[in-house]
Curated annotation (Swiss-Prot):
It is an enzyme of class 6 (ligase). Belongs to the QueC family. This is 7-cyano-7-deazaguanine synthase. ATP binds at L9, S10, G11, G12, L13, D14, S15, A16, T17, V18, L19. It comes from Ralstonia nicotianae (strain ATCC BAA-1114 / GMI1000).
Length: 224
């Protein structure tokens, strides 16, 4: 039987690449997305398309309304998404504890289906400065996962994989292109419209556009 892995899938470029990488490593992949009250639903529509295109065995979308807490421009319409370029420090688009919440859901699903590997698209090179995308965070979460689960305490080690964490955006795009990822299906924009068209000026759009240019790969992003 093939090894199973849970892959966090937002619908964006990074997580699509990570799903393709997990497939290439021979895993039977289970894709997990979250409807957490983000500004638009087009990234979840993108996640559905990516999961189908890359052959995920199952794709689950979990509802968990983080708008009740707010604290981020992605979950609070009163806060504006920055459009002036990537700045120093942790930006207002950081969603409090989002990766920890999503990895915890993935961990629960992993135990339920007998998966021992979690994959997610954390990146500490071309990114917006999020604290839960750093190597030390990934290592700490893996320690937690093995202390907090039946599998872990019985010696069936759970691994938290962040295969693109040290890659530039250009390197990620080149790797995905080699694996056949169709980036036209992905949505990275923080404020995409209902058709998935990108704003072109938020941090995520700027980093994505620069990545395609540096990778010398045609950019299929639809801008409005």
């Amino acid at each position: 039987m093939k090894k199973r892995a849970i892959v966090l899938l937002s619908g964006g470029l990074d997580s699509a690449t990570v799903l393709a990488m997990a497939n290439a490593q021979g895993f039977e992949t289970y894709a997990l997305s979250m409807r957490y009250g983000q500004r638009h639903s087009s990234e979840l529509e993108a996640a559905k398309k990516v999961a189908a295109a890359l052959g995920a065995v199952r794709h689950e979308i979990v509802d968990l309304d983080l708008r009740r807490f707010g604290g981020s421009a992605l979950t609070d319409d009163a806060l504006e998404v920055p459009t002036t370029g990537v700045q120093e420090g942790i930006p207002i688009t950081y969603v409090p504890a989002r990766n920890t919440i999503m990895l915890s859901l993935a961990l629960g699903w992993a135990e339920a289906v007998g998966a021992r590997d979690l994959f997610f698209g954390a990146n500490a090179v071309d990114y917006s400065g999020y604290p839960d995308c750093r190597p030390e965070y990934v290592a700490a979460y893996e320690t937690l996962a093995n202390l907090a689960t039946k599998a872990g305490v019985e010696g069936d080690h759970i691994r938290v994989n962040a295969p693109i964490i040290a890659m530039t955006k250009a390197e990620i795009i080149q790797a995905g292109a080699r694996l056949g990822v169709d980036y036209s299906l992905t949505v990275s924009c923080y404020q995409a419209d209902d058709e998935g068209r990108a704003c072109g000026v938020c941090d995520s759009c700027r980093i994505r556009r620069a990545g395609f240019e540096a990778a010398a790969v045609p950019d299929p992003t639809r801008y409005r």
